[in-house]
Amino acid sequence: GYWNEGKQFGDGLMYTLPWSKSTEVLYYNKTFFDNNGIKVPTTWDEMEEVCAAIKAIDPASIPLGYDSEGNWFITMTEQLESPYTSALEPHYLFDNETNREFVKRFRSWYQKGYLTTQTLYGAYTSGLFVAENGTRSYMSIGSSAGATHQRPTKGADGNYPFEVGIATIPQVNPDRPKVISQGPSVCIFNKSNPQEVIASWLFVKYMTTSTDFQAEFSMTSGYVPVLKSVADHPVYKEFVSKANGGDYISALSASVCLSQQEAYYTSPAFNGSSTARSQVQNLLAKSLSAQGNDDEVIDKAFKEAITECEYQN
């Protein structure tokens, strides 16, 4: 998936090389789950059941926080094999019945108090997840590179208030898992000075093919290495072996990311693809929270998103 991302432009040529990547993972309060006999959800159906169970135990809670509405929408289209965008015209394909149905389902979850998002909460939902007072959540879906932000602050006794667990995000079909691949890729531009091009290539080559660099960068940044060989690097192997939901939560996140490497997907890039992402993010936030008839609210949100995509591009 990392390699193919650089060849997605229709002519079979390689334009970018992967540097480091992240994805989304499900952070959960393992202590709470274990104490209450709750199973980590692997599907969205199970997620609904878990949210209901958590709400029954802690009525003041918001069981699930999801940081990126855009990622959520796009990932659902990928899991459902439903159209989102195309590199060829027509570009904007996301206004369809399948997508409207999953948005309607999540709207009902929001109305039941099961979830919030970064836009609706007004900040990263990790703030709810690590909260010790007031409203809190017990699950948070966010970037794998931000694992340390999903860890509560140590108490005066040197212990964490709860242990964090990390898992693959829920799926529509666990036999065909799909999780988003994000993070920087690099490309080299042609320049009039060939020495600049050579220097660029040597720099890119080092960043993308050196196992030592990839291992060190991953451990420092929280991003996942793009070379399979890094998994056998002695320093990186030792790092991952320490994985836990406390001091080594970044290692735990990395181990989950490595275990799901066959599930990664990317969306086609074209002039206007970033607009589509912004608009489906707005669409989902509006559809969850707007007052009114469900179908009318959702219909309006989809139509406005398509109109804005076409207007801007």
Identify what each model region corresponds to:
Residues 12, 35-36, 112-115, 155-226, ...:
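Extracytoplasmic/periplasmic substrate-recognition and gating elements
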Residues 24-28, 77, 186-188:
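Short glycine- and hydrophobic/aromatic-rich loop-to-beta-strand nucleating segment
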Residues 32-33, 52-56, 123-140, 282, ...:
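Short helices/loops that flank or line small-molecule/ion binding pockets
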Residues 51, 90-120, 169:
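Glycine-centered hinge/linker elements that transmit conformational signals in sensory
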Residues 16-18, 180, 245-305:
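C-terminal capping/gating helix-and-loop segments adjacent to ligand/active sites or protein-protein/ligand interfaces
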Residues 69, 141-150, 184:
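Beta->alpha turn/N-cap motifs
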Residues 1-23, 39, 161-170, 238, ...:
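Hinge/lid segment of periplasmic solute-binding proteins
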Residues 2-24, 48-92, 107:
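Extracytoplasmic/periplasmic solute-binding protein
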